[in-house]
């Protein structure tokens, strides 16, 4: 993260390590949702990039959150915003599934889904895409 960079996080199990592992010093910023509000990361990154042109903005988002509000990337395309979006793709609402497995072992419901081709989606929004598997 750049010395004045902004990191936006979405809700989800993938984001928890970021809270502990990424050191922040002013004027760096981390923008994250309260109470598990999925879909926060991408719109927050777009807003941060619009508000602070010239500052590096990186978004960490799960595939579930991306599918909820990822269409906001159209604004990034339209405005030529240099966002970096890192997507954790596991095909499930991980936090919800963990709670279901705890309360109803072996009976998760409605937590898995099939993603579109996220690499193709990123390219469609004009982003250079690198897949790490």
Protein language model regions, located:
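Active-site pocket-lining segments that scaffold enzyme catalytic pockets across diverse folds
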Residues: 1-13
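Thiamine diphosphate
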Residues: 17-133
């Amino acid at each position: 993260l750049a010395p004045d960079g902004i990191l936006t996080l979405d809700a989800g199990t993938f984001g928890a390590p970021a809270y502990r592992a990424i050191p922040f010093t002013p004027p760096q910023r981390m923008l994250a949702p309260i109470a598990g509000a999925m879909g926060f990361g991408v719109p927050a990154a777009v807003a941060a990039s619009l508000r602070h042109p010239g500052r590096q903005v990186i978004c960490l988002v799960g595939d579930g959150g991306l599918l909820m509000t990822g269409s906001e990337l159209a604004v990034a395309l339209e405005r030529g915003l240099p966002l970096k979006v890192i997507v954790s793709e596991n095909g499930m609402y991980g936090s919800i599934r963990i709670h279901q497995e705890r309360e109803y072992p072996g009976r998760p419901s409605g937590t898995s889904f099939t993603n579109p081709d996220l690499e193709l989606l990123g390219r469609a929004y004009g982003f250079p895409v690198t897949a790490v598997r």
